[in-house]
Amino acid sequence: MAEKYNPQETEKKWQDKWAADRLYHAGEDSPKPKWYSLTMFPYTSGNLHIGHWYAEVPADCFARYKRLNGFNVMRPVGFDSFGLPAENAAIKHHIHPRIWTLNNVENMRRQLKTIGAMFDWDREVITCLPEYYKWTQWFFLKLYEAGLAYRAKAPVNWCPSCQAVLANEQVVDGTCWRCETPTTRRDLEQWFFRITNYADELKDHDGLDWPEKITAMQRNWVGKSYGAEVSFALDCPAAPEQEIKVFTTRPDTIYGVTFMVLAPEHPLVEKITTPENKAAVDEYIKKSRACTEIERLSTEREKDGVFTGAYVTNRVNGHKVPVWIGDYVLQSYGTGAVMGVPAHDERDFVFAQKYDLPVITVIAPPDYDGQPLEAAYINEGVMQNSGPFNGLPNTEGKEKVCDYLAEHGWGKKTVNYKLRDWLISRQRYWGAPIPMIYCEKCGIVPVPEKDLPVLLPEDVEFRSGGESPLKYNEGFVNTTCPVCGGKAKRETDTMDTFMCSSWYFLRYTSPGYDKGPFDPEKLRYWMPVDLYTGGAEHAVMHLFYSRFFTKALRDMGIIDFGEPFKKLFNQGIIVSNHQKMSKSKGNVVTPDNLVAEVGTDAVRAYLMFVGPWDQGGEWNDSGLSGMSRWLNRVWNLFTEEYTPQTASAEAERELKRTLHQTIKKITMDIERLRFNTVVAALMELSNSLAKFKEAAAVSAESWQNSLKTFALMLAPVAPHIAEELWANLDMEYSIHNQSWPKWDEELAKDEVITLIIQVNGKLRERLEMPAGISEDEAKETALNSTRVKPHLQGKTPASVIYVPGKLVNIVVK
């Protein structure tokens, strides 16, 4: 056995052997229960950073633990490889996105292997390869067949200087990322998925073990609101429409409406605007189109608008109210029109003050004296100035007003959602082509399944304008209609990259299957994912889209389950000097350098020790060095010869108790994903074992068994050194095929406990007592303590409270 531990040599040796033996390949013929462990796959940016390791390592530790506990564990790996960065690299470095991406895959694959994770590399998927995106296109066709994919006009970002469409990612602070010209908005035909059809299901997380912050974010993203749709009479000869509809969550305030605001994009704006107001309205619309939705909805931005010159009539009281346009109203939410009730809405109150619009109080605050309000009153109260509803509590009035509106045909109860359909069109090259064809005779025609995949052409010219090169590639664009055989053109938009990541977890179950996107039997065996780990930033994108996708496939009969991920865990982030790591700050930690310096296992153990996994922690080079030294001490603990001296029954009992207590603690902590305390417990155990070794009072057999137990618990944390130590104990290969140690509750019990004695909640004594002490004995001992008696002042205690094995609290009045 080597005298000094060489981590790099040992780690490479075992990584090579594990790979050659396909140790971590998981099949479907195992009698063991399955466990599907998955971490969100990385984007092919080129290099793994320490954040990738922090996502992977604790998840790998848990997967290894499950394997040792008798589970058939699948832990696949792959690469999210379509997207805008590859296209930007093509322009910047004059290299094809495919070459840039696959070079990055090769490098990142090498880096991932150094983690020493139990990845099943037989299951690797790369989303930019035709054998993968063929099925992405197939899913698009299935969604189209089901009526869930449709084409409609939608606003896009436009750079007037480049004369090009820009992706949202290419707009920086409202300007073009290349020329810094202020961007505007234009309407273009785009492809959407009807994710809104699943709004109610997507806000329901029953049966899922997910963080509350994620489920709350998804519920808020869906934004379900109960209210009423109300119609206001429109008297405008230029508009054939006779009314404008609004959605409101406050029908109880309908009598307080003093203005209406339409979104600048509302189809009625052009029709109802009077000639004298047209110039101002047109200028305002032009200005609003230069703003992103985020800017328009910002709570910090002052709300403004322009009067159209038109009026509508509030049918409940006959009041004529002016119609304005304002960019804080979005056409895509509700009806694209809102009623202004300044007395009871903070935003409306500010708007009314700015433009000197009336404020009518219709919900009276407590002790209201009839004076004008100094701010919007948004709480509950009694209805006033509300016709037949005067004197009603407004909570009751909501229901009655809705009934009144429905009775007169002026409105109805309805439910509204903030959620909008998923726009999947991208005007770029490096994505899965949308498999649709446009024929002058037949219209929009889907590509036949037998003709999939629609391949990305290799001979493309990358332009800096922001438009897809596919648009100018005649060999790609020009095709024949599959229905009539006439001349036709292909769709030149590609799909949002989130489309690829919305089903990759399904492909992992049978990545080589070529008769469909997955083998139904293997899918049935593995899905759903038992533990999914990754960043919380994906709450309302990837995680949301994956759930929609799964539910849609279920409804199409393609799969038989509706949720992809049983348990979700979001890791925190590793920071340096209390700052998030970034290249610009020069504080990025490169794992390759760390592995070369101290080895993989030291990096793994330190990452798990640095802080609670869900919170992250502060990177510290000295902490990593300390972890390396600890592993060397563990190595010495195993390799330095043990020679028992005098046998001691007490030492044997204490060793067993120490081992069984540690097994219990580590098992419970791993189950709770508390890896920092797992590593701390291993450190404490190694220190205890060192003392037992020095005392040499336990038998050689007991010592050997303690080392085996320690190695097994070390294996998920530091798999390479654990494998080496196991081999050096002459144990059967591999340690990762063994069984996790079990604790005996009796052996784990302390013989002596520390009993806290309090009087009226104040600490008065600590007593070392036998672990099996009864309640009566504990109370009697506490009452007779010489340190406690003076605080009782000769009085009989009102009560004596006993917390078993921990505390006695004496209450004296």
Curated annotation (Swiss-Prot):
A GO biological process held by the record: leucyl-tRNA aminoacylation
The keyword Ligase appears for this protein: yes
KW Amino-acid biosynthesis (keyword) present: no
Catalyzed reactions per annotation: tRNA(Leu) + L-leucine + ATP = L-leucyl-tRNA(Leu) + AMP + diphosphate
NCBIfam families tied to this protein: leuS_bact
Enzyme Commission numbers on file: 6.1.1.4
Alphabetical keyword list: Aminoacyl-tRNA synthetase, ATP-binding, Cytoplasm, Ligase, Nucleotide-binding, Protein biosynthesis
Organism for this UniProt entry: Dehalococcoides mccartyi (strain ATCC BAA-2266 / KCTC 15142 / 195)
Taxonomic lineage: Bacteria, Bacillati, Chloroflexota, Dehalococcoidia, Dehalococcoidales
Family: Belongs to the class-I aminoacyl-tRNA synthetase family.
Leader peptide range in chain numbering: none
Ligand binding (ATP): 583
GO MF entries: aminoacyl-tRNA deacylase activity; ATP binding; leucine-tRNA ligase activity
Name used for this protein in its record: Leucine--tRNA ligase
Renumbered ranges of motif 'HIGH' region: 42-52
Top enzyme class: ligase
Domain of life: Bacteria
Compartments it resides in: Cytoplasm
Location of the motif 'KMSKS' region: 580-584
Single GO cellular component term: cytosol
A Pfam match: Anticodon_1
